[in-house]
């Protein structure tokens, strides 16, 4: 082959018009250009001679020096790909379009058509079902009733009580190729549902009618998920992978679609027509359109156009590990689908968290690709800036599930003028469109002054659009069906996956291996934990203490073997959490058809086998000979093999539990339940002879039984157990008689039966894991919850009636007294000048007086210790300064914007002023109305709205406000006044319709982002503060929601409060609402501090007065212009230092004078003073915290109800398994069976309680940090509320378990024994729950808490006195027995039940003697044991409260 290529190079030379195509910068050669062209022509000629398959895999690559060489495109390295892209696209904004045009020109030259997709939807309706009103709240009662109701509905016994919730109503339209479509609409208008319907990804639970077609083909004729790409608004990624790896994996799974065939055809036609392409474009297309490449040039191209090159090799990160920023994560979500071959893109809110310039750049690059390569795109955006809005060709406006307008962007304002509405001059069209259909905002745009305004409903708009000329034209087009013969054969995909199954398996294997390397600390930690536990086990079962004389010696050996099984089995438990962590991104990839579920499941299993080998080898090598098991190398390896099988079986089982549970709390409960069943039925806790006939099937299917039998047979049929004990009446060896006494089969073949069964289980569990992944969907989808008011409002809207907003959510008596007021609302720019009746109505109710206060700060500096990474880069300073001498004054009734680019120090300045910083060095002076700031008093008069909206998820909106007002308003305010004030704030912030809505968790359920944001403002406002800080109150909101929040903020300022907002990229509207501006540049220095003026006139005048600064264009956003002209690049170009210019300006001198004036107290004023640190007494704080926790627990059935149900099922299971064993006292084994039931119940119920309480405490702790910083309460009342609420639930749990089990097992019915049983169970559950809380309180996050607590469970289990009785422990370990909480529980339970029984056993000793000799338990000591358990609970409670008070893991 090589020789042939040489021959072609020498023998044929063809001069070509390469200069037309060549980049002129390449002509810098050492030889003449002509010579180089000749040489290149030879290379091309050689390429032309190759067969097509090889020709499209080879290309001519030009190197940096200008030399060109022939390369195999599958072997391009990172540097070569980077250089190629650098030549094609040097500056993304300018060169991407040129590059795409070159690419299109090449395709057009040979007359090839690119595949295009036209998407039509006709009469599409989507309906869901929802519960209404209080029945929709997830209380323990509703949870139970709903389960029963759904079951009876399923059996058609009860009618369905859910109400229909229409999401989309009879929508029709056409999405054309080569055009960009913008989808707009207020929240809950059905945008996401429409995009999902178009992408063929609607949920199976929804009722869908109508049809969606691609090029005239119905969805069942092709694979929609691969022909189009849906980009979700949720950023679900694996945190341990880098940005480049995430994109490369996506590209590898999606393949290149039909591009390979197009490339082959293109190459064939070019060869026939004798056309030589541009070498760079040629090599790019070959590298991008060839299948089966691990690192594709498409990945690099996507990184470049999305501006992700800067973080390409940074890990994505998650809430635990710091990674890329929110904006970069959003772009990664977009890029993940753009690297694929899909020709239609449906993008859902891709701009959240991005600044307007980045959004513009991304949308522009998508637009270039759509226009030039004839793709299809529908993009929904939240707050598109005017310049981004102008990039689109078509607009779809949705409202209340109906299409109000669909057609060219140019005609949209014409339609609304035809309806009587005009967009004001300084208003973005997109913002206008989102507000004009809303009842609250519509009136301000009414233009027909001669006619009185009447609210126009969405249905009226929709009907009017059908009659409008654009609507008629659309109807005519839809009436003519698409001509299927015009559809390109490659446009729609019929193959389910992008590449071959083998390739997908390789891709998943490579990713799993990568994740294992990234998570190596987990495996190292597990090995260290195993080594530590092996060391403890070795020293506990030392050969000097281990004899082989009696069956009791055998029991200790069996205990050691059983513990080895438990340790190896529990070692697989981490698989459960690791599986669940990866599930969200797995479901996303599965639903997008990246890979079949088995390709994901197989590597997850196979790659863990080597780790199992190492872990088990550590355990067996350390313990086998030291403990003194049978000294036979064959038996050593047999134990090793068996434990490897056990570990693999356990890992498979826990992976399966993760895939079935799909949620960490549910999976933990499932996992515990299964583990419990497997262990109880394993033959150690309860011997085979004592298993009831109705449970014997459980014994035969328990994997632990096979493991227990095999490992026991391996040990007890060895030579050292082959002697007949002295005084024995039978001829059986000690080993055989011991096995028989414990109900184990004394047959050597049982080793191989056990090992075979375990291997069978390994395959079964992993197979079921793959099946669960394939068929189950994500757990706990966001549920639609409708309030009665929402239903009424929707129905009224449909009928065109107007319903009073302020009356929604009030009782009928209140409604009668309500002051009727117009729902109109002034636009924000006009509000500054005039106060309307509506505004007066808003002001009237601020019934609580407050003192207007100003805040001044002078020369504020803030520094932190220099990070190690920066020191490594050569920074020598000890401190990194984030704020450098910032000064300013914020006054009552003035709304100040705090602005600057990312990293300028906006939030830092706000945190410093509000006293929220937990570390660092602060200098400078801060005064409140002239008096030095004292943080304790300041917290009482200030509110701080954080950027992340942190609220307790299980309370309603009204309860959140009630709680805040209760704890933050002064004691003098009575309940009635407080309630009136809350109503007032709710009206001001437009929360009345949401009064009974559950807050929920962000992105999961409950309130939308915008509603959550308003709640954050309201929670601070009900505290009646004089000064309010708000950190980015409009980030992540659409224009309409941002307008509502800003209207709220403006209303707040108009009451005479001092309000400061950091703001990122405000629209003209939002910017106009501010009175003053403090502008920072990167590095924390001020550039402008002063008034904005009407339509930002003062700001514009100041900057336009600086030499070289370009004038602002008409209608351009002053905020965007200001950030552009003060950027680092502009500063460098102008040669100006804006900080210096400001410091030398008249404005600076005026500000300094103002600061000086406000820093002196007014003559009649006095300093702030409060007699107590908190506004409410300690008792009230405790009551309030308890009240909130009560609602939080009552509405958290996944925690409370599941725990009670789990206990109920375990009680029934134990009762039936250990039926009547408590009354049998003939043999030692009878007692051990009854004691085993106590041991296993204590261990599992306790661990279950401790595990499930951890996530609850972790979520509440973040809320606690916010509420404590706001001065609502101290740490002790919080700890009181958190612990007190557990007591009744634990009591219920104890009663359910205690009564059922005590009766069924048949313990002795005396009042004292029954009371002691309940007492010990109650305090055991209590200390376990407190232990779970304590571990969260002393660790930074829930994951570390889980790891630490699980390590202790293993040790507690070993030293509890059941596996090894205290009498058989070496002296040096007995101290641990005394500090192990479970040992005292077992002491109390066993001694209280059996410690005074005089019945004789078959060994001729009484039960009391056996208990004392074997366990060293005395009945007289029960009272002291009770006190010790109370003491343990108090100790854990104290550590929890102390840690919550002392440790603050929130770093600011």
Curated annotation (Swiss-Prot):
Disordered as annotated region, ranges: 808-830
Function: Cellular strigolactone (SL) transporter required for the exudation of SL from the root to the soil. The presence of SL in the vicinity of the roots is required for development of symbiotic interactions with arbuscular mycorrhizal fungi (AMF). Transports SL in the above ground tissues and is required for the control of shoot branching. SL regulates plant shoot architecture by inhibiting the outgrowth of axillary buds. Involved in the regulation of shootward and outward directional strigolactone transport in roots.
Tissue specificity annotation: Expressed in root hypodermal passage cells. Expressed in stem tissues, particularly the vasculature and nodes adjacent to leaf axils.
Residues annotated as domain ABC transmembrane type-2: 504-716, 1180-1394
Residue stretches spanning the membrane: 521-541, 554-574, 609-629, 640-660, 664-684, 694-714, 753-773, 1199-1219, 1239-1259, 1287-1307, 1314-1334, 1344-1364, 1375-1395, 1421-1441
InterPro entries noted in UniProt: AAA+_ATPase (IPR003593), ABC2_TM (IPR013525), ABC_trans_N (IPR029481), ABC_transporter-like_ATP-bd (IPR003439), ABCG_dom (IPR043926), ABCG_PDR_1 (IPR034001), ABCG_PDR_2 (IPR034003), P-loop_NTPase (IPR027417)
Membrane topology recorded in Swiss-Prot or TrEMBL: Multi-pass membrane protein
Protein name listed in UniProt: Pleiotropic drug resistance protein 1
Superkingdom: Eukaryota
GO molecular function, one term: ATP hydrolysis activity
Organism: Petunia hybrida (Petunia)
UniProt record, GO biological process: hormone transport; regulation of secondary shoot formation
Biased composition (Basic and acidic residues): 812-821
Signal peptide: none
Classification via Gene3D superfamilies: P-loop containing nucleotide triphosphate hydrolases (3.40.50.300)
Residue span, ABC transporter domain: 152-425, 855-1107
Pfam families listed in its UniProt record: ABC2_membrane (PF01061), ABC2_membrane_7 (PF19055), ABC_tran (PF00005), ABC_trans_N (PF14510), PDR_assoc (PF08370)
Any one GO cellular component localisation term in the record: plasma membrane
Family: Belongs to the ABC transporter superfamily. ABCG family. PDR (TC 3.A.1.205) subfamily.
Swiss-Prot/TrEMBL keywords: ATP-binding, Cell membrane, Membrane, Nucleotide-binding, Repeat, Transmembrane, Transmembrane helix, Transport
Recorded phenotype for the gene knockout or disruption: Enhanced branching phenotype. Defective in strigolactone exudation from roots, and reduced symbiotic interactions with arbuscular mycorrhizal fungi (AMF).
Cell location: Cell membrane
Induction of the gene: Induced in roots by auxin, phosphate starvation, treatment with the synthetic strigolactone analog GR24, and colonization by the arbuscular mycorrhizal fungus Glomus intraradices.
Binding residue positions for ATP: 185-192, 900-907
């Amino acid at each position: 082959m090589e020789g042939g290529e040489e021959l072609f190079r020498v023998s044929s030379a063809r001069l070509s018009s390469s200069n037309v195509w060549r980049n002129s910068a390449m002509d810098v050669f050492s030889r003449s250009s002509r010579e180089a062209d000749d040489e290149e022509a030879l290379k091309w000629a050689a390429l032309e001679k190759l067969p097509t398959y090889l020709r499209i895999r080879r290309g001519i690559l030009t190197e940096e020096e200008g030399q060109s060489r022939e390369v195999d495109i599958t072997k391009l390295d990172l540097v070569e790909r980077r250089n190629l892209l650098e030549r094609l696209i040097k500056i993304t904004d300018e060169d991407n379009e040129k590059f795409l045009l070159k690419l299109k020109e090449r395709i057009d030259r040979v007359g090839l058509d690119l595949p295009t997709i036209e998407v039509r939807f006709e009469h599409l309706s989507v309906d869901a079902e929802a519960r209404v009103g209080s029945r929709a709240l997830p209380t323990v009662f509703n949870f139970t009733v709903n389960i029963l109701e759904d079951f009876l509905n399923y059996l058609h016994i009860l009618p369905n009580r859910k109400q229909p919730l229409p999401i989309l109503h009879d929508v029709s339209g056409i999405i054309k190729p080569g055009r960009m479509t913008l989808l707009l609409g207020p929240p809950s208008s059905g945008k996401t549902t429409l995009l999902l319907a178009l992408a063929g990804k609607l949920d199976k639970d929804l009722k869908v009618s109508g049809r969606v077609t691609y090029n005239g083909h119905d969805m069942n004729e092709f694979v929609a998920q691969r022909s189009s790409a849906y980009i979700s608004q949720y950023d679900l990624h694996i945190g341990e992978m880098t940005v480049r790896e995430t994109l490369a994996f996506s590209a590898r799974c999606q393949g290149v679609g039909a591009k390979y065939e197009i490339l082959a055809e293109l190459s064939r036609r070019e060869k026939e027509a004798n056309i030589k392409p541009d070498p760079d474009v040629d090599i790019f297309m070959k590298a991008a359109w060839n299948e089966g490449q691990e690192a594709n040039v498409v990945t690099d191209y996507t990184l470049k156009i999305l501006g992700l090159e800067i973080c390409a090799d940074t890990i994505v990160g998650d809430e635990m590990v710091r990674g890329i920023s929110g904006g970069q994560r959003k772009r990664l979500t977009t890029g993940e689908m753009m690297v694929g071959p899909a020709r239609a893109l449906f993008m859902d809110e891709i701009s959240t968290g991005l600044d307007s310039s980045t959004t513009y750049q991304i949308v522009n690059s998508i637009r270039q690709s759509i226009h030039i390569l004839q793709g299809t795109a529908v993009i929904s955006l939240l707050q598109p800036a005017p310049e981004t809005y102008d990039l689109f060709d078509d607009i779809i406006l949705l409202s209340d599930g109906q299409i109000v307008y669909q057609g060219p962007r140019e005609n949209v304002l014409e339609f609304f003028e035809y309806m009587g509405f005009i967009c004001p001059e300084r208003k973005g069209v997109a913002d206008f469109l989102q507000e004009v259909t809303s009842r609250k905002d519509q009136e301000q745009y009414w233009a027909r002054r001669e006619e009185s305004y009447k609210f126009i409903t969405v249905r009226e708009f929709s009907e009017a659009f059908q009659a409008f000329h654009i609507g008629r034209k659309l109807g005519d087009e839809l009436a003519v069906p698409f001509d299927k013969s015009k559809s390109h054969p490659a446009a729609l995909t019929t193959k389910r996956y992008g590449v071959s199954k083998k390739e997908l398996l390789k891709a998943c294997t490579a990713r799993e291996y990568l994740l294992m390397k990234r998570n190596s600390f987990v495996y190292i930690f597990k090995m260290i934990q195993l080594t530590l536990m092996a060391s403890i086990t070795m020293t506990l079962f030392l050969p000097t203490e281990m004899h082989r004389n009696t069956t009791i010696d055998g029991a200790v050996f069996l205990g050691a073997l059983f513990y080895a099984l438990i340790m190896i089995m529990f070692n697989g438990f981490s698989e459960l959490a690791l599986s669940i962590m990866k599930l969200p991104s797995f479901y996303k990839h599965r639903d997008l058809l990246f890979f079949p579920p088995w390709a994901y499941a197989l590597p997850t299993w196979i790659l863990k086998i080597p780790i199992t080998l190492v872990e088990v080898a550590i355990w067996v090598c350390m313990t086998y000979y030291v403990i003194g098991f049978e000294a036979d190398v064959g038996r050593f390896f047999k134990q090793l093999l068996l434990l490897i099988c056990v570990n693999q079986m356990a890992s498979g089982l826990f992976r399966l539990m993760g895939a079935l549970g799909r949620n960490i709390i549910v999976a933990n409960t499932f996992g515990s339940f299964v583990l419990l069943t497997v262990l109880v039925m394993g033959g150690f806790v309860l011997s085979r002879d004592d298993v009831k006939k109705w449970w014997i099937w459980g014994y035969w299917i328990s994997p632990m039984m096979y493991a227990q039998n095999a490992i026991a047979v391996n040990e007890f049929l060895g030579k050292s157990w082959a002697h007949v004990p002295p005084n024995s009446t039978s001829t059986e060896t000690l080993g055989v008689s011991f096995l028989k006494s414990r109900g184990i089969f004394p047959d050597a073949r049982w080793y191989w039966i056990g090992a075979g069964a375990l291997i069978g289980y390994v395959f079964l569990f992993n197979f079921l894991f793959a099946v669960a992944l394939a068929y189950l969907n994500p757990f706990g989808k966001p549920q639609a919850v409708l309030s009665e008011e929402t239903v009424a409002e929707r129905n009224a809207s449909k009928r065109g009636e107007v319903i009073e907003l302020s009356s929604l959510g009030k009782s009928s008596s209140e409604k009668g007294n309500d002051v009727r007021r117009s729902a109109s609302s002034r636009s924000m720019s006009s509000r500054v000048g005039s106060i309307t009746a509506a505004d007066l109505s808003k002001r009237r109710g601020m019934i609580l007086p407050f003192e207007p206060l100003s805040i001044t700060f002078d020369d504020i500096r803030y520094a932190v210790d220099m990070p190690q990474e920066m020191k490594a880069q050569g920074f020598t300073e000890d401190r990194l300064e984030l704020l450098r001498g910032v000064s300013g004054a914020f006054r009552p009734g003035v709304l100040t914007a705090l602005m600057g680019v990312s990293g300028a120090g906006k939030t830092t300045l706000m945190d410093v002023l509000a006293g929220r910083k937990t570390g660092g060095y602060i200098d400078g002076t801060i005064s409140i109305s002239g008096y030095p700031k004292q943080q304790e008093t300041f917290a009482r008069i200030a509110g701080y709205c954080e950027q992340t909206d942190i609220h307790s998820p299980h309370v309603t909106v009204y309860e959140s406000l009630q709680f805040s007002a209760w704890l933050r308003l002064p004691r003098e305010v009575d309940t009635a006044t407080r309630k009136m004030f809350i109503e007032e704030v709710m009206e001001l912030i437009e929360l009345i319709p949401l009064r009974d809505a559950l807050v929920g968790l962000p992105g999961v359920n409950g309130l939308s982002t915008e509603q959550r944001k308003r709640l954050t403002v309201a929670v601070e406002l009900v505290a009646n503060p004089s000064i309010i800080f708000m950190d980015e109150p409009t980030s992540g909101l659409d224009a309409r929601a941002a307008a509502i929040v800003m209207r709220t903020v403006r209303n707040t300022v108009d009451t005479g409060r001092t309000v400061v907002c950091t703001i990122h990229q405000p629209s003209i509207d939002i910017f106009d609402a501010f009175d003053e501006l403090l502008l920072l540049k990167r590095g924390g220095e001020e550039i402008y501090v002063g008034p904005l003026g009407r339509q930002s006139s003062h700001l514009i005048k100041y900057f336009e007065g600086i030499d070289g600064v370009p004038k602002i264009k008409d209608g351009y956003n002053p905020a965007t212009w200001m950030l552009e002209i003060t950027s680092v690049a502009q500063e460098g170009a102008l040669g100006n230092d804006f900080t210096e210019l400001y410091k030398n300006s008249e404005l600076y001198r005026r500000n300094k004078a103002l600061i000086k004036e406000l820093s002196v107290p007014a003559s009649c004023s006095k300093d702030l003073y409060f007699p107590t640190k908190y506004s409410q007494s300690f008792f009230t704080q405790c009551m309030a915290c308890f009240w909130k926790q009560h609602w939080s627990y009552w509405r958290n059935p996944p925690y409370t109800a599941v725990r009670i149900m789990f206990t109920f099922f375990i009680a029934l299971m134990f009762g039936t398994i250990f039926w009547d064993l408590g009354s049998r006292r003939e043999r030692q084994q009878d007692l051990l069976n009854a004691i085993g039931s106590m041991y296993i119940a204590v261990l599992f119920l306790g661990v279950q309680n401790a595990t499930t309480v951890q996530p609850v405490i972790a979520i509440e702790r973040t809320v606690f940090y916010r509420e404590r910083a706001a001065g609502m309460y101290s740490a002790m009342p919080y700890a009181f509320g958190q612990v007190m609420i557990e007591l009744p639930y634990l009591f219920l749990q104890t009663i359910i378990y205690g009564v059922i089990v005590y009766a069924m097992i048949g313990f002795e019915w005396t009042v004292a024994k029954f009371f002691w049983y309940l007492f010990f169970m109650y305090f055991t559950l209590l200390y376990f729950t407190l232990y779970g809380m304590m571990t969260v309180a002393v660790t930074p996050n829930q994951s570390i808490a889980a790891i630490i607590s699980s390590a202790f469970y293993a040790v507690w289990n070993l030293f509890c006195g059941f596996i090894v009785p205290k009498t058989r422990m070496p002296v040096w370990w007995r101290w641990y027995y005394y500090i192990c909480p479970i040992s005292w529980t077992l002491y109390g339970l066993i001694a209280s039940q059996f410690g005074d029984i005089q019945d004789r056993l078959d060994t001729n000793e009484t039960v009391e003697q056996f208990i004392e000799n074997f366990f060293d338990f005395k009945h007289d000591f029960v009272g002291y044991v009770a006190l010790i358990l109370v003491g343990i609970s108090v100790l854990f409670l104290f550590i929890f409260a102390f840690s919550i008070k002392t440790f603050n893991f929130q770093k600011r």
